[in-house]
Regions:
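Phosphate-group recognition and catalysis centered on beta-loop-alpha active-site segments
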Residues: 2-14, 22-408
Length: 408
């Protein structure tokens, strides 16, 4: 996922980000901070410049605003995110809209809308029975009457104070916003759409891949090294995009600490689960499908012990880089309940701990970027690490190389 690094250097620092966070938003727009002088590049032990790991605003700045709203994306850019992440699902009339899943009662006010009460239903999505309201049962015009709300109001009450202000955006609106934000801040801001539940949507006649390619084409982003990358938890649709549907932008294959891609499940393939794709053979298969980057859960890189503390570094990054794949893990969140125990600030699960400190060993392990709900803290983490690289050029070669772990 090198597209943004190839286009522009960062134009923000943590101080400007902190100002952006503290300022309330009466409207989705976020005032542009003054562009500071870019920090000097760090160097490796060989004296070569070290690429700056990319910060991806996960669902926007979703630690501060309701996720997947234009306001969340604007704030992510203001805080210094290199890339913003819209998750894509389809409407009944085939429009790509931005939600983390097609089940929308957790992130919109649809359950409080009596005119849509009869749309509540139960469906099986990726083998799981779900009850609620689904995007594919609404036209775009109907979805636009809804308003977004915070997914975790008890954890993020400040974000919940913005409930009811923002619409559900379309993917096209996010692409248009990306262009405006890039012009506003004088740097290319990347976009990394995730195609959600591709096997399911294909099964109901609402395949999204073709429209993704069309929109990237229309916005000049369907080319190598463009500030755009397409991601999926399934490999089959990424292969189809690369081999048959004309996608030229880079791709990311996402994985998890357990389970299997649903395309494998649907095909009855009991071999190609997410564990398989952590092996050298699995990664070579991913690369052969034309994929550029792996997006694992961060616990696939440094494990989590049973007591919640940080465990051992795995061979994941080393194997991926050997296969020609970059590594961009998800999702770093600042609240204690999402951190390894040694980085928690207190027993309060909703208080913020030391996310900046927790990210450091992952950067040392050699990751190429990361997803975070708190882009301002993500930028601070990278700034801290880059300064450490300048002062200690040998830092961050990855423990896997030092330990000589065997390749599976």
């Amino acid at each position: 996922m090198t597209s943004v690094r190839r286009h522009a250097a960062r134009g923000l620092v943590a101080l400007a980000a902190a100002v952006a966070v503290s300022a309330p938003l009466a409207a989705p727009a976020v005032a542009a901070p003054a562009a500071p002088t870019a920090p000097a590049a760090a160097q490796s032990v060989t004296g070569k410049p070290v690429a700056r790991p990319e910060v991806v605003g996960h669902r926007g700045a979703s630690g501060y605003r309701p996720e997947h709203t234009l306001a969340a994306y604007e704030l992510a850019a203001a805080q210094g995110a290199d890339v913003i992440e819209p998750d894509l699902v389809s409407t009944k009339d085939g429009v790509l809209v931005v939600r983390h899943e097609n089940l929308i009662d957790g992130t919109t006010d649809v359950a409080q809308r009596p005119e849509f009460a009869d749309r509540k239903t139960t469906k099986v999505v990726d083998g799981v029975a779900l009850t609620g309201w689904f995007t594919e049962d609404f036209t775009l015009a109907e979805l636009k009457t809804l308003r977004a709300k915070e997914r975790l109001p008890q954890v993020r009450p400040e974000s919940a104070s913005y409930d009811g202000r923002y619409q559900v955006p379309t993917f096209e609106e996010v692409l248009e916003l990306r262009e405006r934000l890039s012009a506003r801040y004088g740097r290319e801001i990347g976009v990394i759409p995730e195609i959600k539940h591709p096997t399911y949507f294909d099964s109901i006649g609402l395949s999204m891949e073709e429209r993704v390619v069309e929109l990237l084409d229309e916005h000049g982003l369907n080319k190598r090294n463009a500030p755009a990358t397409v991601q999926s938890f399934e490999l089959a649709n990424l292969r189809d995009l690369n081999e048959n549907l004309g996608l030229k932008a880079e791709t990311v294959f996402l994985s998890s600490v357990n389970g299997a891609p649903y395309d494998s499940v649907a095909a009855g393939d009991t071999v190609r689960d997410y564990d398989f794709y952590e092996t050298a053979a699995g990664m070579r298969e991913v690369r052969a499908a034309g994929v550029d980057t792996l997006g694992p859960a961060f616990a696939q890189i440094i494990t989590k012990e049973k007591d919640g503390s940080m465990g051992e570094e795995t061979a994941f990054v080393s194997l991926a880089h050997r296969a020609g794949l970059e590594v961009v893990p998800y999702t770093f969140r600042a609240e204690n309940q999402f951190l390894y125990t040694e980085f928690r600030s207190s027993v309060d699960p909703n208080a913020q701990g030391d996310m900046v400190g927790m990210i450091q060993p992952f950067l040392d392990a050699g990751i190429d970027g990361f997803f975070t709900d708190h882009p301002d803290l993500g930028v601070q983490a990278v700034d801290t690490w880059m300064q450490g690289k300048k002062e200690h050029p040998g830092r961050g070669v990855g423990k896997t190389a030092q330990r000589g772990l065997k390749v599976r």
